[in-house]
Regions:
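Pre-NBD coupling/linker segments of ABC/ABC-like ATPases
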Residues: 2-3, 242
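ABC family nucleotide-binding domain
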Residues: 6-230
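C-terminal boundary and immediately downstream tail of ABC-type ATPase nucleotide-binding domains
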Residues: 220, 227, 231-252
Length: 252
């Protein structure tokens, strides 16, 4: 992580409701370029909702949110900012969301051609490099249904990287994978972290969080209960809720 002080993400007093349920409660969060932030917490705590607010997939009701110098407004009233943010922010989901009728390479090259205006030759050249980078260059001509879950998730990662994002969001990227396939996806993410990519990761993989994170955030019932360097949060958590959560998940 570098010491650039201007945050790429700034949340101030952000609130999100689903009906009467207060999902995010006065969230204050700055993320600086090059930082790897891992968000942990129980299911339903608001982790995924938080990162989905960052790229406008979820509207929020009040507060301030600036992403890469573009301000997102409450209730989704930020069409132009949203378009810019979605070209600068990549996201990898639990499900792979690949186009089943397109080859692996075509899945990776489509958005750069349609959105960024790359020529087909340039997009193909870049796409092949990215597939090699995530370790599946030999799968370029196959279709998603012919790949394992781990391979499909690495295609999804290459597709997100093809837009040359300044920030990558990961929403439990290994939760839909068979256990033996989790490692290959985490390895690709480790390489990204080493290269200095700014990353916000929601995960249940605590060993991975300890290894790659610059900062770990524990969310409890829509609030940031505790945050800090991984060695501090995992080894000497201060908040009773953090202690209880870690005692449960680290037993398994």
């Amino acid at each position: 992580m570098n010491d650039t002080t201007q945050p790429i993400v700034r949340m101030q007093q952000l609130n999100k409701h689903f009906g009467s349920l207060h999902v995010l409660n006065n969230i204050d969060l700055d993320i600086v370029p090059g930082e790897v932030v891992v968000i942990i917490g129980a299911s339903g705590s608001g982790k995924s909702t938080l990162i989905r607010c960052i790229n406008g997939l979820e509207e929020f009701q009040s507060g301030n949110l600036v992403v890469d110098s573009s301000e997102l407004l409450p209730y989704g009233k930020s069409t132009q900012a949203l378009q810019k943010i979605r070209t600068e922010v990549g996201m990898v989901f639990q499900q792979f969301n690949l186009f089943p009728h397109l080859s692996v390479l075509d899945n990776v090259t489509l958005a750069p051609m349609k959105v960024r205006g790359l020529s087909r030759d340039d997009a193909i050249s870049s796409g092949k490099r990215l597939l090699d980078r995530v370790g599946i260059a030999d799968q370029a001509d196959k279709y998603p249904s012919h790949l394992s879950g781990g391979q499909q998730q690495r295609v999804a990662l290459a597709r997100a990287l093809a837009m040359e994002p300044r920030l990558m969001l990961f929403d439990e990227p290994t939760s839909a994978l068979d256990p033996e396939m989790i490692g290959e996806v985490l390895d690709a993410m480790r390489e990204l972290a080493k290269e200095g990519m700014t990353m916000v990761i929601v995960t249940h993989e605590m060993g991975f969080a300890r290894e790659v994170a610059d900062r770990v955030i524990f969310i409890h019932k829509g609030e940031i209960a505790e945050q800090g360097p991984p060695e501090k949060l995992f080894d000497t958590p201060q908040h009773e809720r953090t202690q209880s959560f870690l005692a449960r998940v680290l037993k398994h």
